[in-house]
Amino acid sequence: MRQKFRFAAYVLAGFGLIFLALTIAGARLYTDWLWFQSVNYQRVFATIIISDLGLRLAVGLTFFVLLFLNLMLTRRPLLKVSQNSAIIREKDVLTIQSSPLSQLITPKLLLLAFIALSALMAFLFNFTVAGDWITFQKFLHPTSFGIKDPVFNLDIGFYVFKLPFYIFIYKVINWVILVSAFWVLAAYFVVYFIQGNPGAIFRNISARYHFSFLAAIFFGLKAAGYQLEQYSLLFSHHGAVWGPGYTATHATLLAYKVLTYIALLCALAILINLFLRRFKLVIYSIGVLLIASVLLGGIYPAAVQKFMVTPNEIAMERPYLERNINFTRLAYNLDEIEKRYFPAGRVLTAEDIRANQDTISNIRLWDWEPLQQTYGQLQEMRLYYEFKDIDVDRYIVNGRYRQVMVAARELNQEHLPAQAKTWVNQRLKFTHGYGIAMSPVNELTGEGLPAFFLKDIPPTGPTDLQVTRPEIYYGEASDQYVIVNTRSQEFDYPKGEENVFSTYEGDGGVRVANFLRRLMFAFSLGDYKLLLSSEVDNNSRVLYYRNIRQRVPKIAPFLQYDNDPYIILSEGKLYWMWDAYTTTDKFPYSEPYNKNDNYIRNAVKVVVDAYTGKVDFYISDSSDPLVLTYSKIFPGMFKPLDSMPEDLRRHIRYPVDLFKTQAKMYAVYHMEDPQVFYNKEDKWNLPTEIYASEEKPMEPYYTVIKLPGENKPEYVLILPFTPQNKKNMIAWLAARSDGENYGKLISYSFPKQELVYGPMQVEARINQDTTISQQLTLWDQGGSRVIRGNLFAVPIKDALLYVEPLYLQAEQSRMPELRRVIVAHGEKVVMEPTLDKALEKIFGEGATVQKSVQQPVDVTQPQPEKSIAELANTANQIYDEAMKKIKAGDWAGYGEDLSRLKQVLAELAERAGK
């Protein structure tokens, strides 16, 4: 009785767990539907769900039916075998003994077992097709590339949209046949093994017919597989060529055609054998195909490669190298790069510097890594605020085109004190970040700190930039769901010793509305307190999927995304802009950039409202067939770029990830001559630089410059190139970001007969300068860490100006200060407290017409001595000013006062020591 009760309890618990799992899954599906409705992408959700479930259902049913039919074919022979009786002779007595299997294997039991096994295998197999719904949809909505491959003369759209689905179908049917063969063999084996005669399986005529039939289907599928493998040659790597070279085109391709016919003949032979009953033909067919595969698919191509191609590789591979070069350039848009000549031999004058003040005033002196620490110390204000990242952008500030560093002040609930991590605080009170900090790339205070355009809470500054909607509910640090419009007001921002509270005024999130939704949210979010809280009512709104790195891919999982979404201030509101890419690994003759994909376009710009969470997708490359196909699959999802608000459009920039990929490929594929390409005679490298104290790859950098031959400064992304195994600069690549020039790439090549210093050569000259090296050593010995910033090669007219900032960071401080600027031009290398002074030292007085950088205190200059009383009085005054700024919430000013106080106290200690 106790055992029956325990068994019943286990069964009940099992059903309870299944019911709970189904309830949670159903709740998540329901709340996802509500979420997609809230962002107006319910059609996208419906398309994804219907496509995914429809494909899974079709594959699952196909798998179930085919496996079940195969198992049912074993039913009669298994029943017959299991009912065989055994005759036992003892002395002169014959005893007929029925098989024990006759009691175990019954028609009903076999039927139930076959249904259960087929259903289980179909269910498990369904997990392998997760995500293949997009392959199916692309198959249904292809777009022509307008380019045909040179081998099969098919449009590239066939390989991108059609071929993946054919491969998918082939794999599914192949697995069905293999799994069916396994379970059919297992069923026969179990019966004969129990009877003690497993070797009799293949003497069973039914089993032999069954396996022959499966083998015939397998060989027929193998023939189809060889046809698909012919197409797959276009994305393979053979010798010096990406894509099919001479061997693949003349040997491997021929081998696949012959193997296709051999596989079909083997399938036909096996079918004929069903009538001839010479079952050795099955074994012979398998042997023939295996031998042919080794000879034709392996040995023959290898022999052609070794004895024909390798001794004459360049001559025989030349036409295929041309294809490789041309198609790779197409795949990465390298064929659109405009080539220009850059003399680089000019020596700049003071007049040149004055004439290019728009460029000079936008040279970036602040690197994002040290600046992130400085922002954190000066502008995070409270421990729960966080600057997740520092972004680079450009704005019209007081009528001038300025490059700036900008960061969103997000709220990170993980940084709340342990005692403050209550449910009410984390879900209802601390719901959003607040405002941004923004500083020009080239300005600093007298203490080596950034000079802010926007700072503090609420955001204020000395410019015409204004933030009217500073709340950040959606960002990069918003990982938890929150509930707004509750009976509790939300914490808005700190103000001195008090806090300001607010209520959400947007339409983001999903209304609780009724008890059913509340219950579903409790299940899907795994939070029963949501169900019990008296602070939440029907008008409350649940904000979830708030992290943009989760929010955007939730809507468009078929796109690839850039590593750096960036914050934008537009008409007083805050937005996130994120670059999205369309990619494929099925572009013929193209070399992959990440060991997989061999085609990429920045076809989509995504904009997310930081307050409401609204997500908009804009097509930034309407010539891309992939994004056109996605537009067919999801009508109305993608908007034309022209419909983006004009002020937001001003902040579109060429994405770094795409630029790095193109630069990496262009370093090789700028060589268009097959002979030069084969020998890698003119291969370029991406340069390295000294950052902090280590040699690291040089990153592309944004800057505002007047490109050679252009009339006005513009926002561009730049990266130099160096020759292979050399350190001098050979060229630089620029990507334009402004207006109608957006997306245009220009390659500037230097004359090969002239030496143009590369980044590491400039770094070496800095290290060899005795004045600079001595000063760096003194700072290191004095307890300060010297951080060498990014080295920038700034093109001005037909010359290059190198600029590298230096930061000092005290051992006990987390706030690096910008203390020196190194400038190199021609044969001169100087280090000065400011960029203006460095330029004047190289080019003479009057090289700069405006002082955009405040004069910092020169830490090496002796100051006029003051009395101890004067110093003490000054320290008290600075301390009082700092306390006032704390009460006013001016944390940047407080940080500056602390730096001043530190210097005065150090001088006071020195005077007291005397």
From Swiss-Prot:
InterPro entries named in the record: UPF0182
Main localisation: membrane
Disulfide bonds: none
Membrane topology: Multi-pass membrane protein
Listed transmembrane segments: 7-27, 48-68, 109-129, 173-193, 209-229, 252-272, 281-301
Signal peptide positions on this chain: none
Compartments in which it is found: Cell membrane
Cellular component, GO annotation: extracellular region; plasma membrane
Keyword Cytoplasm in record: no
Domain of life of the organism encoding this protein: Bacteria
Record carries keyword Membrane: yes
Entry protein name: UPF0182 protein PTH_1387
Organism of origin: Pelotomaculum thermopropionicum (strain DSM 13744 / JCM 10971 / SI)
